[in-house]
Amino acid sequence: MAAARNLRTALIFGGFISMVGAAFYPIYFRPLMRLEEYQKEQAVNRAGIVQEDVQPPGLKVWSDPFGRK
């Protein structure tokens, strides 16, 4: 009985970890692997936006989210 209980716990925990990984893939890992595609998409999305017009005074102006330090 103890082995069945441990297996059930491991399956539930493993399923939870898998679901978290599946949720983070399109949010974090896919943009990192397809950098150029996302840079082009952001250029299209931000075309025609003047940063100074939409940026609240006193805050840092947008920076490239794909830029490396």
From Swiss-Prot:
Transmembrane residue ranges: 9-29
Signal sequence, start to end: none
In-chain residues carrying the UniProt-annotated modification Phenylalanine amide: F66
Keywords tagged on the record: Amidation, Membrane, Mitochondrion, Mitochondrion inner membrane, Secreted, Transmembrane, Transmembrane helix
GO biological process: mitochondrial cytochrome c oxidase assembly
Summary of the tissues where the protein is detected: Highly expressed in the hypothalamus, the spinal cord, and sensory ganglia (at protein level). Also expressed on in the epidermis and dermis layers of the skin (at protein level). Expressed in preadipocytes and adipocytes (at protein level). Expressed in the ovary, specifically in granulosa cells of follicles that have passed the primary stage and in oocytes (at protein level).
UniProt xrefs under InterPro entries: SMIM20 (IPR027917)
GO CC terms: extracellular region; mitochondrial inner membrane
Induction summary: By fatty acids, specifically palmitate, docosahexanoic acid and oleate.
Residue ranges that the UniProt entry lists as topological domain Mitochondrial matrix: 1-8
Mitochondrial intermembrane side: 30-69
One Pfam family of this chain: DUF4538
Subunit record text: Component of the MITRAC (mitochondrial translation regulation assembly intermediate of cytochrome c oxidase complex) complex, the core components of this complex being COA3/MITRAC12 and COX14. Interacts with COA3/MITRAC12 and COX4I1. Directly interacts with newly synthesized MT-CO1/COX1.
Protein name (database record): Small integral membrane protein 20
Gene that produces this protein: Smim20
